[in-house]
Every structure is written in structure tokens, then in C-alpha cells.
Amino acid sequence: MSAEGPAPLARLVAELSRLPGIGQRTAQRLAFHILRAPGEEAAALSAAITEVKEKVGLCEECFNLSEGPRCRICADPNRDRTTICVVEEPADVIPIERTHEYRGLYHVLGGALSPIDGVDAEDLKIAELLRRVEGGDVSEVVLATNPTTTGEATALHIAERLRGQAAVTRLASGLPVGADLEHADEVTLGKAFAGRRSLD
């Protein structure tokens, strides 16, 4: 037994602290909570983690999270197929859906352009987006990348690549610069959608 406690506990703390936003102290609190929890609760947590890794993948059309080949949004015949909202990560779809302002389809890039981190256009799902726009009845592409330096660079790159193929709009102000979309509240995000602007 080390100063961190029994080896299995220390391993759990180490694994939990690898999660985003979880520091050493929070990892310790979570580990002790799991240790004190009934066996069924710990087993349910373990089963949920295993299940999500085994059953959740990416939609073959938009690259959002999905339990099958197509996500529920792409499979919904009531969605507006003339509009595609481009986001960086699957987590960004959730707050947009909560606004109930947007009824089109999505396209998840899988990140943002960041030359410093070695992420260029070929590392993202930009070519797939271009194919979707060229091969469909898309009249508007809403660029909802995060209002960060990398998000803005990504939006400008995509706008340039789509010039002349569809109307390209950007979410309006209301989203704080430097913030991530997944942390925006529904009202702010709804206003940003309602006031989106053209990038042509």
C-alpha cells in the first residue's frame, strides 16, 4: 500500500484524473465515492462505459454519434435537407438541438484547423462536407465552429472552399469569443442561430 492507498484505488484515481476537467483531487473524490457505492452502482457504471465504447460510433453521413450506420437526425425524414450546420465535435450538436431553432442536418468536422497542433484540412471531415454539398440539394451551410482562433480559421477556410456552391452563414454574436459551443446556454445559442450572418 502506497501513500495513495491500495494499488487498485491509486490506479482508479490515475485513470479518472486522465479525464478532461478532472484533476487529482476530483479524481480522488470520485474514486472514494465509487468505493463507498453499492456494488450494483459500480457495476452499472462499468457496464455503461463498456456499452458506450462497444455500441456508439459515428454516423456515416454526418459523423455525429450514432448507434447504427446513420444517426437519428440524418434518418429523420422531417429534417430540412437543404441546410447543413457544421460543428467541430459531436458534443456541439446537443446544445444546438436544445434550442429548437434549427431543423436541418449537421456535419461534424472532428476538430478545428490548428497548424500549431499539426491539424490541417486533411485531418478533418472537410472533404466529406464538400462532397455532401456538391452531391445534394444544399442551399445553406451554417458554420457553427467555436468562436475561438482555430474555430474562426476553420470557418473561413470552409467558407472559401464553398464559395459559389451554397450560401455560407456564421452564427451571430452572442457567443463569447474563446468559449466552447457545448458550454453555451440554449437562449444564447438560439439568438446566435436566429442572427446568423452571411460569409459571402
Explain the meaning of each model-derived region.
Residues 27, 75-145:
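Extended interfacial segments that mediate partner engagement and assembly in macromolecular machines
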Residues 64-68, 79:
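Short functional micro-motifs and their immediate structural scaffolds
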Residues 59-62, 71-74:
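Short cysteine-rich clusters marking metal-coordination/redox-active sites
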Residues 1-20:
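Extended, structured, electrostatic nucleic-acid-contact surfaces
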